[in-house]
Amino acid sequence: LVYALESKLVDAAVVSTTSPEKPMYPVAKLVFSPEEVLECAGSRYTYAPNLLALREAYELGVNKLAVVGVPCQVSGLRYLQHSTPDIEVAKWYEKHVVFSVGLFCSEVFTYNGLMKYFEEVGVDPSTVEKLNIKGKVFIKTKNGELVMPLQQLHKYERPACLFCRDYSAELADISVGGLASEGWTITVIRTNAGNNIFQSAVKHGILEVNEIDLESKQLRLLKKLCEKKRTRPLPMIRTVFGP
């Protein structure tokens, strides 16, 4: 994304950041510089309404736009682009969104639920510097680090996430996630638009690439998580709506 802005492949990007007024509260943001992208870097574990920034991009007349989001947001973007072709704003999104980056996502948690969880484990949210969830909950604060079991957090999952079947952002141009070894990111190139930008970044020495083995532990894990999420909603649908 930084490379795309620096090389003028895009003029702006839709991302998320955190509110200065509420700890860890995600908000949508339209960014125009590599510096802004880096300032917004980091995982969000409560829902960030990224697509709200599309309206600002439309009103400002951004010519070439990138969009970053989790699978449901990328799906929403595609609906905006293609399901209402006679609406002016849909035509604009289709023409001016140059590429999308999808983030691997199992689920997110409600903001109030996450704040309650921190209260339960004795952590002041305003002191949290980094939160990471990989099988366990890793919390880095100004006062030290905690590693907690994930089970206690599950009850605060966002209900809508239980109906989502897409783990790897299948409709994005490029999908990325932190399943690889330390310092590496698994990247799935899905479209010509995504491939063109990715290969350009590689050509200019921006990205270091290590082709993944089809039998690697990381790829097997990715397939497992995709399959798990693809089948997970079915029991919930039967429970809510009947058999």
Regions found by a protein language model. Name each.
Residues 1-243:
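Iron-sulfur-associated redox domains of electron-transfer enzymes in respiratory
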